[in-house]
């Protein structure tokens, strides 16, 4: 027999410590995002979000991808009172036993949380509930290190019984911190950087550079799949992918500048194009997947050189992370398996790229190939745009 859950209790973290006006705004946005993710009724009660979904399985899957939620629990509802709680708890623990989660040898604990006025204390109800479990199953009580915790969340007229506490992604509700332009490739790093800024409440306009003929169609297909995966974390907020034809600019870099500077000038142009997109989209910052020292364009000298002349913040949330940390996060959020699909790479990458391009040399090369005009022309021609919502 499967537990017949009728409600989900969702908890939020950072939102709760904001000032009253900010908290109300964030709570309202979180409710909106939940209702946008799946069909449900959702309401705030005493620091919890109570969710009544039409499809419980769908709701549990989608809640794990809604930023602002730190954990959630599917629960069954009982009337508040010893007799009603006893009846519901007996049924609940027998279903736990039928699922193999509770036996006569399973150390367990009752965790009771109470809100409102009642004629009993939390400790009294926990002791009573524990005696019900012992009487029915014969399981041993272990408050210090139980294998199973059964929770009673008691409100004025209703009590919620649950044993699962499922982690949420945490962070801030999507759409509460403004808009950013994220440079998105088919690699491992930039999707993770984009995810981390989404986790901090940012709405994302993803910008991808189509480097054809130096890259193949496989690279573009990967980016579409990565964007779709990231959009799963953007319930309630539009996720936009804009793809620009960038190959002509790369060809100009290879023709008009030292070959070893190709990667630096490529990144230099990306930032300037992203700044134009940010102005058009009303975004306040650029995001990229730079991790210090990982590739030629991400050494400190080259980070300095590639960002010259850009007048809005460039945020690099991965800057202090190593490759293993980034890969582990990519696996957790579901982008890793897409990113590692072979796509042929970029044939414009030189055999020996510069790792320390002097800023004055980069500026001289950028003026020689007229980067600003090249990039402006790419921007004027527009982008292929796809919206995920």
From Swiss-Prot:
Give a yes or no for keyword Calcium in this entry: no
For this UniProt record, the keywords arranged alphabetically read as follows: ATP-binding, Cytoplasm, Nucleotide-binding, RNA-binding, Thiamine biosynthesis, Transferase, tRNA-binding
Main location class: cytoplasm
Q: Which GO terms describe its molecular function?
A: ATP binding; CCA tRNA nucleotidyltransferase activity; tRNA binding; tRNA-uracil-4 sulfurtransferase activity
Q: Return the broad EC class.
A: transferase
| A biological process term (GO) from this entry | thiazole biosynthetic process
The chemistry this enzyme catalyses reads: [ThiI sulfur-carrier protein]-S-sulfanyl-L-cysteine + a uridine in tRNA + 2 reduced [2Fe-2S]-[ferredoxin] + ATP + H(+) = [ThiI sulfur-carrier protein]-L-cysteine + a 4-thiouridine in tRNA + 2 oxidized [2Fe-2S]-[ferredoxin] + AMP + diphosphate; [ThiS sulfur-carrier protein]-C-terminal Gly-Gly-AMP + S-sulfanyl-L-cysteinyl-[cysteine desulfurase] + AH2 = [ThiS sulfur-carrier protein]-C-terminal-Gly-aminoethanethioate + L-cysteinyl-[cysteine desulfurase] + A + AMP + 2 H(+)
Any transmembrane segments, and where?
none
State the family it belongs to.
Answer: Belongs to the ThiI family.
Indicate what this protein is called per its UniProt record.
Answer: Probable tRNA sulfurtransferase
Which species is this UniProt entry from? Answer: Methanothermobacter thermautotrophicus (strain ATCC 29096 / DSM 1053 / JCM 10044 / NBRC 100330 / Delta H) (Methanobacterium thermoautotrophicum)
The major lineage groups are: Archaea, Methanobacteriati, Methanobacteriota, Methanomada group, Methanobacteria
């Amino acid at each position: 027999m499967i537990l017949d859950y009728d409600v989900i209790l969702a908890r939020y973290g950072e939102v709760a410590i904001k000032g009253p006006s900010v908290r109300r705004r964030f709570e309202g946005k979180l409710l909106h995002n939940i209702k946008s993710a799946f069909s449900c009724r959702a309401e705030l009660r005493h620091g919890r979000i109570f969710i009544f979904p039409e499809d419980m399985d769908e709701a549990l899957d989608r809640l794990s991808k809604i930023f602002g939620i730190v954990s959630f629990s599917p629960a069954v509802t009982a009337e508040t009172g010893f007799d009603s709680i006893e009846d519901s708890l007996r049924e609940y623990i027998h279903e736990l036993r039928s699922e193999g989660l509770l036996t006569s040898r399973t150390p367990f604990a009752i965790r009771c949380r109470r809100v409102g006025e009642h004629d009993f204390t939390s400790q009294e109800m926990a002791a009573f509930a524990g005696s019900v479990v012992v009487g029915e199953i014969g399981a041993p009580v272990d408050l210090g290190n139980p294998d199973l915790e059964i929770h009673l969340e008691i409100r004025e007229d209703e009590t919620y019984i649950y044993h699962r506490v499922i982690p949420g992604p945490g962070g801030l509700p999507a759409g509460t911190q403004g808009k950013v332009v994220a440079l998105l490739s088919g690699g491992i790093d930039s999707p993770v950087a984009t995810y981390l800024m989404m986790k901090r409440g940012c709405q994302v306009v993803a910008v991808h550079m189509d480097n054809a003929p130096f890259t193949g169609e496989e690279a573009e297909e990967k980016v579409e799949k990565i964007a779709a995966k990231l959009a799963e974390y953007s319930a309630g907020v539009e996720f936009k992918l804009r793809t620009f034809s960038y190959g002509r600019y790369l060809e100009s870099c290879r023709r008009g500048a030292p070959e070893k500077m190709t990667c630096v000038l490529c990144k230099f142009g990306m930032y300037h194009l992203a700044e134009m997109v940010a102005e058009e989209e009303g975004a306040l910052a650029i995001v990229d997947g730079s991790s210090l020292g990982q590739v030629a364009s991400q050494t400190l000298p080259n980070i300095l050189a590639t960002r010259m002349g850009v007048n809005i913040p460039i945020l690099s949330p991965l800057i202090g992370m190593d490759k293993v940390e980034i890969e582990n996060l990519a696996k957790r959020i579901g982008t890793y398996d897409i990113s590692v699909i072979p796509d042929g790479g970029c044939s414009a990458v030189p055999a020996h790229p510069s790792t320390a391009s002097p800023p004055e040399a980069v500026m001289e090369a950028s003026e020689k190939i007229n980067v600003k005009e090249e990039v402006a022309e790419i921007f004027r021609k527009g982008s292929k745009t796809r919206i995920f919502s």
